[in-house]
Amino acid sequence: MQAILEHLYQGGRISREQSQQLFGAIIQGQLAPEQLAAALISMKVRGEYSEEIAGAASALLADASPFPRPDYTFADIVGTGGDGSNSINISTASAIVAAGCGARVAKHGNRSVSSCSGSSDLLAAFGIRLDMPAALSRQALDELGICFLFAPQYHSGFSHAMPVRQLLKTCTLFNVLGPLINPARPPLALIGVYSPELVLPIAETLRVLGYQRAAVVHGGDMDEVALHAPTHVAELREGTIENYTLNAADFGLSAQPAEALRGGSPEENRDILARLLQGKGEHAHESAVAANVALLLKLFGQENLRDNTHRALEEIHSGAPYARVMALAARG
């Protein structure tokens, strides 16, 4: 282990197997905080490679508590966080809306580390039980088309890294890992990343991890599909990665200012999203969610982004997404 750490300190890259060994030790609490901090910063400064990310993800998935994986097609939609935008929880709202459009979503999330409100902070504010047993979460996925999997419930090893992550107050490989270690192991994923430099490496990592189809996005300094700036996309399909750019017009939408998506505390975000999911939200909010839902639906084989956007907006305006949230909360 010391040889791996020393190699990292010298700015070297490590193999997938070495990364799996390193992160296996991390989640077993075998590294001192100083060693962990130094390793994470060493990788951050020179940039993380896809083999290293895949090795780390494999270590955490191997250690995860089991989830009864369905045999039907389902997805995750999740962002790394750490983009500094403090926006409303677009991916969480998108997951709920997408479920009403026929896309089953098992969303993996956590409490906030570096922003105002993570997905789990928001869900707790809605009264949704974060420690729902795996069998009940699977039942919700079957019957409601959506479930939320709280990372610490399935990845106890995260606790060993959390104090160091909070102390560093910056994005590290752990921010990148969160979207890749969904214990349900979805075959499809829409993943937002906090830096454009991560778009292709994460897509390559998804290919190594065996995803059927996925899209990795970064738009205008946000880990989402953006409407205020071009969105950079790396789409994985049948082992091939295609890079392209999307603009608001591709969704049949008008551009919206980034400031319009500013969020706040979990309670404030809950109120914003409650209005949105009841069909009473702000135009910029529903447009942002609809665009992200549209790209997610594309991964399910619904290729027309404009049609998908229209469908998502109809679902939002119906108010049905809010009823879905309340139904999930009632399963407490």
Swiss-Prot record:
Binding, 5-phospho-alpha-D-ribose 1-diphosphate: 79, 82-83, 87, 89-92, 107-115, 119
Residues that coordinate or bind anthranilate 2: R165
Binding site for Mg(2+) 1: S91, E224
Top enzyme class: transferase
Positions bound to anthranilate 1: G79, N110
Cofactor(s) the record lists: Mg(2+)
Keyword hit for Repressor: no
Source domain of life: Bacteria
EC number: 2.4.2.18
A GO term, aspect molecular function: magnesium ion binding
Keyword set, alphabetical order: Amino-acid biosynthesis, Aromatic amino acid biosynthesis, Glycosyltransferase, Magnesium, Metal-binding, Transferase, Tryptophan biosynthesis
Xref: NCBIfam families: trpD
Stated family: Belongs to the anthranilate phosphoribosyltransferase family.
Function statement: Catalyzes the transfer of the phosphoribosyl group of 5-phosphorylribose-1-pyrophosphate (PRPP) to anthranilate to yield N-(5'-phosphoribosyl)-anthranilate (PRA).
Identification of the protein by name: Anthranilate phosphoribosyltransferase
